[in-house]
Structures are given as structure tokens and as C-alpha cells.
Amino acid sequence: MSKVLVLKSSILGDFSQSGRLIDEWVAARRASGDTVTVRDLAAEPLPVLDGEIASGLRGGESLSPRQQEALALSDALIAELKVHDQLVVAAPMYNFSIPTQLKNWIDLVARAGVTFTYTAEGPQGLIQGKQAMLITTRGGVHKGSGSDHVVPYLKTVLGFIGITDVDTVYAEALSMGPEAAERGIKDARDQLALVG
């Protein structure tokens, strides 16, 4: 049995296609005996990184209450990531990129000296032994093209903190008519059955 951390980031709630796919996947994993923790980053938004929070994430003795709160939240998010075997990220494409809600999580988790460090050979990720899966939904078709700033970015960030074993599931063409959308969802379900 595995411990899985799922990050949902769609702002569309019940209308979210990535949310429906991830909910089906979570139900199947729980039925197989896995422990799944779901963090809905849109329903419970995290603070947006600003100068005060960024400064506070470095720690120190004279932190403001807001900085102390952000540092404690960052520590909790990192601890949550560390205790799970697998990270699953539901990442819809919004205007060629990831949702702000997901970026907020990244900004609180990617911390020098905590989840990565700089060495003479370059940066080294400190989150080791984890596997990740990205489930990305898009209105158009972007896989493997220069317009996909979701998957390459997320793989870079995850690799930077040490998570390099990453599978990707694509649901594309979801705004290109009912038949294309149905095909896109079916393809994603088929991919999930293979990698999930």
C-alpha cells in the first residue's frame, strides 16, 4: 500500500475536467487500499508569495506574525510531501501555464536548504525516493509543442527538488467539440489505467 498526496488546482469546482479525472483515480486507489490525501488548492487557497513572505521563508529571529505563519505553513506542506510515497498533481492549462493556486504551493515548497541545496556541482534536490504523476487537461492540443508550459515547467520544478520519476497523463482537445472532448477524456482514462 502506498501513501499518495494529490494536489487539485482547478478553479472550476464541480465543472473541472481534471477534478473529475482525479476523483475517479483517487476512488480507485482508495479501493485498492492506498492511503490518499487530497489537498484542493482552489478550495483552500495558499498565500501568494510576496516580498514579506519570501523574506520570512528564509527564517530568522525577528519574523512578523505573517511571516511566522507562512513559514509554519511552508514547513507543514513540506512535511506533508515528505511522508507520502507519490505526488499526483492535477494541473489544468490556463493560458498556456499552470493555475496560480498550484504556483502558490510550489512557492511555499521550493525552499533553499530545505527541499533543495546549491552545491559546487549545481543545485541538488533534497526530496528523494518519490514518484510523481501529472494529470493535465487542456482545451486544445499542446502535448510536445512549444505552447505547453505546464508539463516542462512542472517537471523542472519537481526535478529541482529531487523528484525525477514523473509520469504524465494528458487530456487534450477538451474545448474542440463534444467528440474531441470525449476522445480526450477517454485517452486520459486509458493512460491513467496504464500508469496509475
Swiss-Prot record:
Paste the cofactor note: Binds 1 FMN per subunit.
Keyword Oxidoreductase applies:
yes
Entry-linked InterPro entries = Flavodoxin_fold, Flavoprotein-like_sf, FMN-dep_NADH:Q_OxRdtase_AzoR1, NADH:quinone_OxRdtase_FMN_depd
Is NAD there in the keyword field?
Answer: yes
Q: Which domain of life is it from?
A: Bacteria
Q: Which cofactors are reported in the record for this sequence?
A: FMN
Under which name does UniProt file this protein? FMN-dependent NADH:quinone oxidoreductase
The protein's organism comes out as: Shewanella amazonensis (strain ATCC BAA-1098 / SB2B)
